[in-house]
């Protein structure tokens, strides 16, 4: 799936909610704590990690490609 952002970055837990992977922040926290989320192939351990355009986030078999909308920051 492709998620477009118009800001410089989005925090990992916010991205998971925005993409519909989780319903709320506590679910995102659990997924990250259980090491179920990777960013660019590395296990993510910080729910506030800054995700930028070009990053690839994976949760199980779901892959999220983060892109920039082209609008200015």
Task: Name what the model sees in each region.
Residues 44-73:
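C-terminal structural segments of small proteins and small subunits
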Residues 1, 12-15, 64, 72:
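Small beta-barrel nucleic-acid-binding modules, principally OB-folds
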């Amino acid at each position: 799936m492709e998620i477009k952002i118009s800001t410089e970055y989005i925090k990992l837990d916010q991205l998971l909610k925005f993409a519909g992977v989780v319903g709320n922040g506590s679910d995102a926290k659990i997924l990250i704590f259980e090491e179920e989320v990777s960013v660019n192939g590395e296990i993510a351990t910080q729910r506030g990690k800054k995700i930028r355009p070009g990053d690839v986030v994976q949760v199980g078999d779901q892959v999220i490609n983060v892109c920039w909308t082209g609008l200015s920051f």
